A protein has these predicted regions:
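Positively charged n-region of N-terminal signal peptides that target proteins for export
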Residues: 1-6
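Bacterial N-terminal signal peptides
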Residues: 7-19
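Accessory terminal helices/loops
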Residues: 19-25, 179, 193-281
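Metallo-beta-lactamase
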Residues: 24-29, 33-35, 83, 115-167, ...
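Conserved beta-strand hairpin/beta-sheet module of binuclear metal-dependent hydrolase folds
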Residues: 28-77, 172-193, 198
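Active-site neighborhood of phospho(di)ester-bond hydrolases with catalytic His/Asp-centered motifs
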Residues: 59-61, 84-93, 112-114, 162-164, ...
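Active-site HxH/HxHxD metal-binding segment of metal-dependent hydrolases
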Residues: 65-67, 75-149, 246-257, 261-265
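Active-site environment of divalent metal-dependent phosphoester hydrolases
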Residues: 66, 92-98, 118-121, 167-170, ...
Length: 281
């Protein structure tokens, strides 16, 4: 009888723990205004709505499952999803562009992408060094190159090509106004390949090492933006520059110092990865 009681208690404990685990999904920030005309509308992965009087720009659509989250968040903020006129992306990995096809079907928005990432979107296949899961193929209405401009309703974003994480990874740069002041804002593209990706003689991205080194040098040469918006939750655990008028719960927000520190870490880690890969040749 005692043994039976033990098993009953153990089974109950397992059921309780299972209930707790499944009942507590990861909590992500509600939709909110970041700064100026930039809003967070993402969920598990980053997605930003840049609003203008003539329609809106959506940066990244996340995974397929995140589509409904974005649609709901846009509505919660008081905007119409149908007013999204342009879709851009940080880079063509599934967790950032898998929702492009559904969003284009819903809104009719123009899809804009750079070089190799445009090819990935058109094919519905990841062509980065990692060869990750793909996405539903979507027509790219405008294929851009480094330095090109995307403009809508008085808002201008400039594309900075940063290959390495993907072939067409793009940092988008703009300026916003908040409280009568101008702030430079950059949206992360992707600096380095994912950990564990083959770097030597990679069949998908043969120049991944050279491209990544170029990207790191380009980003280091930039004047650090006032605000750098990451495309993943970072839980940075450090306060933002007090001069930045940004909500403290924005865990994708990085100030100029955090941006510089991130680049230093990325360069150090990538240098070590290349050294290890070359040692195994």
């Amino acid at each position: 009888m005692r043994r039976l009681n033990v098993w009953v208690l153990l089974s109950a404990a397992i059921l309780f723990l299972g209930t707790v685990i499944t009942a507590q999904p990861a909590a992500f920030p509600e939709a909110f205004r970041v700064i100026g005309n930039i809003y967070w509308v993402g969920g598990e992965y980053g997605s930003y709505l840049i609003t203008t009087p003539q329609g809106h720009i959506l940066l990244d659509t996340g995974s397929t499952e995140m589509h409904d989250v974005i649609v709901s968040n846009v509505k919660k903020l008081g905007f119409k999803v149908e007013d999204i006129k342009i879709m851009i992306s940080s880079h063509a990995h599934w967790d950032h562009v898998q929702g492009h096809a559904a969003m284009k079907k819903l809104t009719g928005a123009q899809v804009v992408a750079l070089g190799g990432d445009a090819a990935a979107l058109e094919a519905g296949q990841d062509n980065s060094a990692g060869g990750f899961p793909g996405m539903i193929a979507v027509h790219v209405d405008r294929v851009i190159k480094d330095g090109d401009i995307v403009s809508l309703g008085g808002t201008t974003l400039r594309a900075l090509w940063t290959p390495g994480h993907t072939q067409g990874a793009t940092v988008w740069m703009t300026t916003v106004q908040e409280g009568g002041k101008n702030y430079s804002v950059a949206f992360r593209g992707g600096e380095v390949p994912n950990d564990g990706v083959p770097l030597i003689n990679n069949p998908r991205h043969p120049t991944v090492i050279e491209d990544t080194r170029m990207t790191l040098q380009r980003l280091k040469a930039l004047k650090p933006p006032d605000l750098f918006l990451h495309n993943h939750h970072q839980n940075l655990g450090r306060p933002l520059d007090a001069a930045l008028p940004v909500d403290s719960h924005c865990d994708t927000c990085m100030d100029a110092k955090a941006f510089t520190d991130m680049l230093a870490r990325s360069e150090k880690n990538f240098t070590e990865q290349v050294r290890d890969a070359e040692a195994k040749k």
